[in-house]
A protein has these predicted regions:
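Extended alpha-helical surfaces
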Residues: 1-208
Length: 208
């Protein structure tokens, strides 16, 4: 049954409440399972980032290596920012952050525990210093910044036809175009102002 575990949890919760069991006792029963689920999700995310990075390192072309580096670094930054806002401890960050060449994840983890300003201060010393004002603006602005940076880095491949670079760049650019179309459609469906949609728009691979 598709919703079996969820329905079972809801049933357990309502049954215990109906029997007059105090909320704190209900939470003591249910929360460990929820924590385990969050831990499993974090482990899966970390494994996925490690796999992306390993594949990038093994690639022959710098476009693929640079894409893997940027993808993992951006994910680490987002994890650190979210963890800081939700008060996650250092050991959580040490498990969640995936190592990469452009970030010292141990320093990033410690900065996230220290506070938001510490994250910004650390990033100012890295290749992602220009991401700091974007992060201060909003999470969606940082997402846009990441996508635009990737597009700028792969754009020169248009003029390098005798390697795998143009094909890799084309596939990444097509993914970016699909994301942009979804942003436009979502804005239309949700009746967002044109300015709100435009500020989420990504740069295109070929600016015709």
């Amino acid at each position: 049954v598709e919703n079996g575990p969820q329905l079972h949890t809801q049933s357990t919760l309502s049954d215990r409440a109906a029997l007059g069991q105090p909320p704190e006792e209900i939470a003591a029963v249910l929360l460990p399972g929820m924590r385990d689920k969050l831990l499993q999700d974090g482990q899966i995310d970390r494994a996925a980032l490690d796999a992306i990075y390993a594949a990038g390192k093994a690639a022959d072309h710098p476009v693929i290596r640079d894409y893997a580096e940027m993808t993992v670094a951006a994910a680490d930054i987002k994890i650190a920012v979210r963890a800081q806002k939700t008060g996650k401890p250092l050991d959580f960050l040490q498990r969640a952050l995936a190592p990469c060449d452009s970030l010292d994840v141990e320093q990033l983890a410690k900065a996230a525990v220290e506070g938001q300003d510490a994250i910004y201060s650390y990033l100012q010393k890295t290749a992602y210093a220009d991401a700091v004002p974007v992060l201060q603006e909003s999470p969606s602005a940082f997402e846009r910044w990441c996508d635009n940076r990737i597009i700028r880095e792969i754009r020169p491949q248009q003029y390098n036809p005798f390697t795998v670079g143009p094909l890799a760049a084309f596939l990444l650019a097509r993914e970016n175009e699909v994301k942009t179309v979804r942003i436009i459609l979502s804005g239309k469906w949700n009746h967002l102002r044109e300015e709100a949609v435009r500020e989420r728009m990504r740069e295109m691979y070929r600016n015709v």
